[in-house]
Amino acid sequence: MFVLPPPPPRYTVPVAYAAGASNGMAVPIVETNNIITHPEKGCPLQVGEGTYQLQDDLHLATPPPHPSEAPIINPNPLATVPNPPTSGVKLSLISLGLRNKTAFPSKVQVTARPFGDGNSALAAAPVKDPSKKRKPKNNIIKSSSSFVSRVIIHEATTKRLNDRDPEGLFAFANINRAFQWLDLSSKHKDEPLSKILFTKAHMISHDVNEITKSSAHIDVIMGSSAGDIFWYEPISQKYARINKNGIINSSPVTHIKWIPGSENFFIAAHENGQLVVYDKEKEDALFIPELPEQSAESVKPSRWSLQVLKSVNSKNQKANPVAVWRLANQKITQFAFSPDHRHLAVVLEDGTLRLMDYLQEEVLDVFRSYYGGFTCVCWSPDGKYIVTGGQDDLVTIWSLPERKIIARCQGHDSWVSAVAFDPWRCDERTYRIGSVGDDCNLLLWDFSVGMLHRPKVHHQTSARHRTSLIAPSSQQPNRHRADSSGNRMRSDSQRTAADSESAPDQPVQHPVESRARTALLPPIMSKAVGEDPICWLGFQEDTIMTSSLEGHIRTWDRPRENISDNYGDQKSSETLGTGKEAGHPASSMGSL
């Protein structure tokens, strides 16, 4: 009997990629192109406002290891040697047009001064034509750098850029040692405009500068597992390496972001617990900490939790770094800027959420997880709430004005890998939160501000009462409100008057709230959207997008309705839904 041979293998398993073997046998590796599919059954997301239909599933090709990497044929599963840091697929999205970024009627005013304002040593050098953006110096196509293995440019890149809709989305995606530039508005979005293959380094995190973007210029920064930072301009195919060979900080970059409103400055979180501010146009120099000459008396009391190794106010700004802050000796997993550009929420593997005034180089508050480390963090569009995800499988909501935990959201069965607000489903009363995790699930949560003032029912009371969902503000002692100048608030329950007088600048340490005092918020929707862990979540005006560990980028179309007009008129009981919709019975809605 004639039997067709099996198709050539597609290499997608990250574990096998790292080890070069599976079950003690060498893995045959064949690199293929990206594959886009349109599942017949789809993966619909049923929510109160309608059904989100799966548009497509774009599967990125996983590159084979570089020839210089010797495969380990028989890895020892009990070996304690740590594997090189890697990351699942994450996306950085950007539109070059006037695409609406949010429908949320935000009243947030950016009053924060620019980072480094007042330090003449950081003043930008004058340029002849301000409209022309400075590009990196090196041509990546002609580069002989050992850091870059190969660059693949689409043969019709110029034509595709000229013919595309300026309102369409570009996406930058990492997958192992590859970095792809995709046009998601193209009919052939599975064909990358360019692909960079690095020799050994994996790009862990990346970000696009919204300030400098134009039809002729895009600034992209990438943080790598080697500690090197890659400044990349894809249209001209120019690049520059920052922190080359770890001259400033040799530990891997875990997260990287442009400072809001800045053309040159960005912050990189390193695995050794340091936040480093870089200038993309400055050269590197061997970093020597600029510790204060005096003893602890000259150091602000708040800095016991933030050691300033180099201040942004330093006059020594001829080379990178601009500033260096040490928060801990453990891994910084993520950070996020507040909408008013004043605060920085930082989460660490040590289980702390640290609220910083990064302009003043101070830690204001320290919150602790219920269990384990934090993995991700984001801000609400109005800056009133911070949401975190962690190794305790929980999504946690924190109130910034009240400086306290509002609710714990239970629904994941494994670590939460990403959280995000959906600004097109938020108004002044209700917020939509999304989360994804290692359990391959996508969860949606609706959080109603109006329910904060309802009296809390005892946790043994019937869970059908909606008042058990949110902890009341009256549960906490009185707190000082922040004035318009942005002064932070203190918790009377955590510090005595004597403490306030002796250490007025000491960060407020918030203990873990007990399960009996903290309310539980159930999801309105829970759905398994793949077979591998989900790593990233993004909301757009007309879509919801996720990306996974093995390279699946999935896009759902929103229900066909004017969501920004209709959503604010829905009742809070409808937005909260019932626990049964998400597969969680109503009887499980007691306190966590």
UniProtKB/Swiss-Prot annotation:
WD repeat start and end residues: 248-288, 327-368, 369-408, 411-455, 529-566
Keywords on record: Repeat, Transcription, Transcription regulation, Ubl conjugation pathway, WD repeat
GO biological process, one term: carbon catabolite repression of transcription
Region of interest: Disordered: 119-140, 459-513, 556-592
Regions of compositional bias (Polar residues) in chain numbering: 484-499, 564-576
GO CC annotation terms, alphabetical: nucleus
Record function comment: Component of the regulatory network controlling carbon source utilization through ubiquitination and deubiquitination involving creA, creB, creC, creD and acrB. Required to prevent the proteolysis of the CreB deubiquitinating enzyme in the absence of carbon catabolite repression. CreB deubiquitinating enzyme stabilized in a complex with the CreC leads to the expression of genes such as those in the proline and quinate pathways.
Complex and partners: Interacts with creB.
Annotated family: Belongs to the WD repeat creC family.
Protein name: Catabolite repression protein creC
Organism: Emericella nidulans (strain FGSC A4 / ATCC 38163 / CBS 112.46 / NRRL 194 / M139) (Aspergillus nidulans)
